[in-house]
Each structure stands twice: as C-alpha cells, then as structure tokens.
A protein has these predicted regions:
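N-terminal Rossmann-like NAD(P) cofactor-binding module of classical short-chain dehydrogenase/reductase
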Residues: 18, 147-150, 172
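Adenosine-nucleotide cofactor-binding segment
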Residues: 87, 103-156, 214
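Glycine-rich phosphate-binding loop and adjacent beta-alpha segment
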Residues: 156-222
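Glycine-rich NAD(P) Rossmann-fold beta1-alpha1 loop
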Residues: 62-63, 89-96, 100, 154-155
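NAD(P)H dinucleotide-binding glycine-rich loop of Rossmann-like/cofactor-binding domains
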Residues: 20-85
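Glycine-rich beta-strand-centered segment in the early N-terminal region that forms part
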Residues: 1-24
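Conserved S-adenosyl-L-methionine
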Residues: 101-109, 167-168, 192
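C-terminal hydrophobic helical "lid"/dimerization subdomain
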Residues: 207-256
C-alpha cells in the first residue's frame, strides 16, 4: 500500500511499501482492510520498477517461490550446468510462480508435478519441459533423476522427490497443503548425501527480503505473465474453499 503517515524515519508519506510474513494474518489482523498499522521493521519498500498491484500479485506465494530458488542457487543450482529440476504444486500459487521464474532466467530442464490431467498443459505453458502425475510407492529409494527439488506441498510429495534426487541433490520445502507428516527414511540422505532445506518466508532476514523483492522487480520479473485473477469480497470465501480443496489455480488478489 501507500504510507499515510509514519513515526519511523525510514518511511514517509506517499512511499509505496509492502508487508508479508511476521504476524500479519496470524496475531496481527487487518490484512484485508483499507488501512493497517504495522511495526516499521516489518515493512519493505516496493522497488521503483514494481507497481503496488504487481507486488500483491506476487504476494507471499511469489516471495516464497523466489526465496526457494534463491536457496537452491545458494546450494549450487546454476543455469550453466542446466540441472534437472523438479517442482511440485506446479499450478498453485507458489509452484506456478517458481516455474515461471526458473523458465524466465534460463533453466530448461524443469519437470512439474500436478494432481490432475487437465493441469498438464497449464504447467507446460508456464515453462515446464515435462509434467508428471505421481503415484505412491513403498520403495525406500528410487533411481536418481533430479538434481534439485522445489517442493511446495509437503508430505508424500516431499517423499516422492527426496527418493529421486541424484547424488548430493538438494530439496527445499515451503508448504504443507498435502499434510504435515513426512514418513521418510534415511537412505537418500546417507547413501546419496542429499540435503533438505526448510523455507521460512515469515521471519526471514530483512536484507534478504529486500534482495528477493529487487530480483522480482528486475532480473526475475515475470509480472506480465503471472497467472492470477482478481476478486471482490463476495467471492472471497468461495476462493478460500477452493484453495483448501486443492482446486485453486495460480494467484488471486482481493480488490478492497
């Protein structure tokens, strides 16, 4: 939004700013109101290259997707080597943005996980080279296929990817829509030396926040191709219900 008034010297009236994470929507209510009062340390200036609306089309999900890619690159993922990358929840809020960013910055070997056949073509249009619908299996270890795994849904999907990582593969996990439990075994870790990294977008360092938003406004900018729809309050609860049932597609912004 736009700063109306501020007692913090870092911000002044008229500044374009955003807030994601911290206690917003948890203990600090008012996320859907026209006015909000928040601590200054929660606030991130919106980069000049990005509009207010665009920042919210990205939202927490877009920020989390970018943060996941940031972490994977920190652990060795790079365009030059063109690694095999697996992305789950490919048509959801986080997964769809992740695939588009990866495709935009030059990664070619992206495999997307979807739940339904009708999502296959959508995932391909987003930038996935291959699309799979996974099936459960009981084997503790499978043939290594992927170098990196960006998981957005958790539980059995996390397990599916971990078992298929190549030697010293790296996985990130940022969501739990498929469940909180992880019935994993240690074989992928001790036989292939894989890493599993948790992504927390709530309390991540403020300097990293600003770096991520700068990337989203510049070299990682996919604002013109983001999959989103805009709704009013009358559609709010229906949209939340679709999200909880795994029927939601892309991003949704609420017009207030």
């Amino acid at each position: 939004g736009i700063v109306e008034s501020s007692s913090n010297d870092k911000f002044k009236e008229g500044d374009n700013v955003l807030v994601t994470g911290y206690d917003v929507g948890v203990t600090h209510t008012g996320g859907f109101s026209e006015y909000a009062q928040v601590p200054g340390e929660w606030i991130v200036p919106i980069p000049q290259e990005m509009s207010i609306k665009e920042s919210m089309v990205y939202g927490t999900a877009g920020f989390t997707a970018a943060l996941s890619i940031f972490e994977l690159e920190k652990y060795g993922m790079n365009i030059k080597s063109q690694p095999e990358i697996l992305v789950s929840g490919a048509t959801g809020g986080v997964g769809s943005v992740a695939i588009q960013i990866l495709h935009k910055i030059g990664y070619e070997n992206i495999t997307a996980i979807v739940r339904k056949e009708k999502q296959i073509e959508i995932a391909k249009k987003l930038g996935a080279k291959q699309v799979i619908i996974i099936e459960d299996d009981n084997k503790p270890l499978k043939k290594g296929i992927f170098d990196y795994f960006l998981d957005t849904v958790g539980s059995n999907v996390t397990l599916y990817g971990l078992k298929r990582l190549n030697y010293q593969g790296v996985a990130t996990v940022c969501g739990n829509v498929a469940g909180n439990s992880l019935n994993a075994n240690i074989l992928p870790f001790i036989l292939r030396g894989i890493k599993l990294i948790g992504i927390d977008s709530v309390y991540v360092d403020h300097n990293i926040r600003e770096d991520i938003w700068s990337k989203l406004a510049n070299e990682w900018n996919i604002g013109n191709s983001l999959l989103y729809n805009e709704i009013g309050f009358e559609e709010f609860y229906k949209t939340i219900d679709q999200l909880l049932k795994g029927q939601h597609l892309g991003r949704t912004i609420l017009k207030v």
